[in-house]
Amino acid sequence: MQFKWVLLFIFIFTVTFHYKNILTFVGIEAGVFFGFKELYINSSGFLEKEDWSEGMFSLLDFNGDNLVNKDEFREFIREYSKEFSWENQLNDRYVFPEQLKKGAFESTLMDTTIGYYIYIPDAYHEQLDKRFRTVYYLHGGRPGNEAREAFISNYIHNIFQDATIDPAIYIFVNGGELSHYNSDELNSYGEDILINELIPHIDRKYRTINDRQGRGLEGFSQGGRAVTRFMFKYPNLFGTVSAGGGSYVIEKQIKDSEGYEDDPRDDKKNIYFVGAGNDAWSLAEQHTYSQNFTPKLMLWSGKNDMNYEGIQEYHYFLLELGIEHKFHILKDVDHNSFKFYEKDGKSLVEFHLLRSESGN
């Protein structure tokens, strides 16, 4: 009898202190069950490319065999259904280079601890008199999660094994609850945290080249949109800007609605006010009337990315404005930064190499 009470106590204790984890587990399993039930499954029990949203299949196809099983579907739901947190752990499904470290700082703005991941090349510990370039990487998706695209550090590490490429410090950023925006509505200020807190923190703590010539900015999807906005808002902070997979259709919609983001792909029908003129189209146009330095820009996209046509339209828009930039396209790649890095990460890394300063 006493044993039963002990078991009951353990059960109550577990539910009380781990109810969020339990609900998350139940939600994921329900998502897998009903998701697989709703979608067409072939006779072998797999999802195929034509059964999923165009331009995004590789996000589910973790092993690259052009089929998605329940385990892969479960991992996808788990990754993109996490509650927002200012500190996140790496996905234990993957192996990361030992040069990738977890960092954190106390945010005055948010009155909390904010995490980041930082890749520190071996040369940093070997060349103690040298200062190093930095590249800030802004993740895709919402809400913010500094661990989401930290797997890219594997590709970066392999590329830096080439002694002809000057290594850099890469910082993987948490963009806040409304990724990379300031939001009074959500009490989340990802933009201000990056610009006013994280960058100064990194420059104080590490031997960085503390000027725009030695500081790069890169992002994908939501992060790709953000880095394009930031290059025009803070041109004196960054020397190079690499924008991948961004939805410039949504940026255009924000422009046309005078600051409201109403993403038609959002099933929750959330509408956020992000600021009139706070979009990649308006900011680029305003920049042409200024005398400000223009960072070196590269737009990049997979040809099969669902955002490709919008990126191409933005590319032509920049050409009309006279804003010089590169447009790097890869065939057989969809909306997946890992796949892009796997195929041609070297081009992305080399883009940020130090060059003599020049601008419009």
What do the predicted segments below correspond to?
Residues K4-H18:
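Hydrophobic membrane-insertion alpha-helices, especially the h-region
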Residues T14-A30:
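Membrane-interface motif at the C-terminal end of an N-terminal transmembrane signal
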Residues T24, F73, R78-N360:
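Non-catalytic cap/lid and distal C-terminal segments of serine-dependent acyl enzymes
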Residues A30-N42, S53-G64:
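Primarily EF-hand calcium-binding motifs
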Residues G45-K49, N66-K70, F132:
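Glycine-aliphatic tripeptides that mark coil-to-beta-strand junctions in extracellular
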Residues E48-S58, K70-S81:
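Amphipathic regulatory helices of Ca2+-sensor modules
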